[in-house]
Every structure is written in C-alpha cells, then in structure tokens.
Amino acid sequence: FHGVDNEGNSLNGFPILLEGNNADIWGSAVADDIDNDGEIEFVISSKNKHCYIIDQYGNIELDFESEHFLMATPSLANLDSDNDLEIIMYSYSSSGDIYAINHNGTNVPNFPVNINEKILKGGAIYDLNNNGKDDIVVATENDDLIAIIYDDGTISNLFTGSDKFKTVPSIINNNGEIIIVAGNEDGFYYGVNLDGSLKFTVVTGGSIHSSSGFVEFNNQLGIFFGSEDGYLYGIDINGNALPGWPQNISGDSTENRINSSPVFADLNNDQIPEVITASEEGLI
C-alpha cells in the first residue's frame, strides 16, 4: 500500500507490504477520521481476507481477519448512534458476508449479514429510510440483484437485472426522489426507484464495469458512465441522452473498452466541466 507526495516521493512509513498469501489489493482505499482523534486513517481490504486501518504515518492500527476474500473497496458509514464511523467490508464468496465493524475491530450489532451473493466492487451508502443512520446498497453477481442492507441488518432485494453486476451502484437524491443506478454485464444501465420499479434503462453495446460519475451544469445533473463498447455515455436524471452524447472514444479499435469511472474538472477555465476517463488500451 503506497503513500506518495505531490511529486511522487514515498511518504514516511510507506509503502506497506501486506503479509499472507493472495495479499492483492483489488479495491481502492477509503479515508476519514474514523475514531475522531483529529487524524485521517486509511482503510484497505485485501484478497488475503484481511482489512486494515492504517494511520497517516504508515502504522497499522487494526488488522481485521475475515473468513473470505475481500476484493471490493470498503465503505465508511454511520450505522449506529455514536459519532464514530463504522467500516463495511464486502466478501467475494457465495455466502455473501457483509461485515461492519467499529474502529477497534468489534462487530456492529446485527452484522455480519449473509446475502448469499458475490460482491466484487463494493457498495453505496445513504440513509434510505430517514432514521438518521446509513444504509448499504450492493449490486451482486450470482442472482443479478440490487439489494439494500439497512442499518439493523435487514435485507431487501430491490431489483433483479438481466445479468451479473460487476460494478458499484450509486445513489442519487433528486429533490427527495431516490434513484439507484448501476450497469451490468448485458450492457444495461438501470435507474431503479426505491420501491423497486424501473425509472429508466439505457442499452449499450458492451458490458458495463464503470461506476457512475456525476456533474451538475446549468442546474441539471449529468450522469456519465463507460461501456466496453468503447462509448462514454452521458444521460440526464430520466435516462435521456445529453446533447452530444454518447461519445465514441474507441475509433476503429476493439480494445478501447471503458472500464474506468469518469471524473470532472474545468480544465480550460471556460466555466464548462470537462469529462475525463481512461480506456483499457491506455488512452486518457
């Protein structure tokens, strides 16, 4: 696990070599002041079945061992009534264990839960039932589900897609209307209401492994995602294509699949955000 400064030099205490077999880090690190000590901690999970809390000096504050591969990016959420953040881990196993622990490694009440579904990339966090506590949304491989795990461990299977989900879902609050979006292996990008009904479907020509990116411009929310058909898609909150979208960045190549999530910046100071993504062929 690497920590570098703005010139690419390793920070003191980094890199950290994880121990054990299969110590690959597939997901991203997440960071916050988990225990309210005034310092930022990093959380990473690994295929070696461990999750680590690491401080900004490279010290491992917690090494939590699970029973399953932890391939997905962990999440931070407030699942209970204290002021500390809890750590959520997603197992890549047929039992579909979802762990939630405190910063000292103890389990959050009612966790872990088993959803009997493999989760590859991670989950989304939001208070869906307005009780002041966060809930978890995941998209799964086995039965092609979008599911909600509420703060008390209750599971609600919200929607069944046409094929496996291998991406992280996203949650949109559109003036009080909750929409969950995710793409699947069939190339379908779904917008799902909180009651499980479909708000929209966008059909692409390839599998969708890209998580969604969001940008607001001219008082309108733009939703962007890539597909393995080589197109970058831009849609509005109703699933309609934005003017000028989708954009084909693959040309005649069959290798320019877009599996990276888009990011946004006003690169030329014209008050219009640019969309930045990367292709599997190595193009930005």
Spell out what each predicted region is:
Residues F1-I284:
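Extracytoplasmic/lumenal domain signature
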